[in-house]
Amino acid sequence: MDDEEPERAERAAAPAASDPAGGLDYSRLYEYRFKDVDQDARQRVWNEIARYLWERLGRPRRVLDPAGGRGEFVNAVPAEERWLVDVVDYPERNTDPAVRIVIGDLFDIDLPDAYFDAVFASNLLEHFRSPEDVARFLDRMRATIAPGGVLALMGPNYKYCADEYFDCADHLLALTHLSVQEHLFAAGYHVREVVPRFLPFSFRSRLPASPALTRLYLRMPALWRIQGKQFLILANP
């Protein structure tokens, strides 16, 4: 898995993606960050991760990715209904036509209430400007989750990747699995599962972009405790 991440870093709640008045130009930032990334290889990695997570989340029927980027997760997750939200409208996004795409600020767009069986947010929280923004996001997602649904959060765990955590220009908040649990509790969620070390911070230089090796990694939690630098947390509203 020599492609960047699965820390995708395309964010749904950022300022205007290509408007200099909005501050950081996210379109140009991600163009630079992923200029040498093989998107096909990256999708192959996510094919395995998405299927694994879908099973772990209880095979949800309706899934929302609120920071969907180029669609790697929603392309692969075998849910009946898939939604992608992102602030960046990537011209090269090659998303399954069955995926419903919503472009815009996550806090401004319309989403159905009590609708999704699962919300999966990957590498999003660290891009918010303040703990208050994290709280707003958790409240926003709680409103969209159906009764019995689940919120899954994945992101770099500062406790295990402090040296490289701020190598990304848009990483603003230092978060660990412990601080995220506090955020969830404060927002009224019930934390049901915590994996402090799940995926590597970046798969670039760790493993080749091989579906077989990705599957092997996902089936061997002992490897997570060595390579894992991202947390995975599941919580119910």
Regions of interest found by a model, annotated:
Residues 1-114, 118-122, 134, 138, ...:
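Conserved N-terminal segment of class I S-adenosyl-L-methionine
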Residues 28, 32, 36-44, 107, ...:
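S-adenosyl-L-methionine-dependent methyltransferase catalytic module, highlighting the catalytic core
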Residues 126:
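Active-site beta-alpha loop architecture of Rossmann-like, nucleotide-cofactor-dependent enzymes
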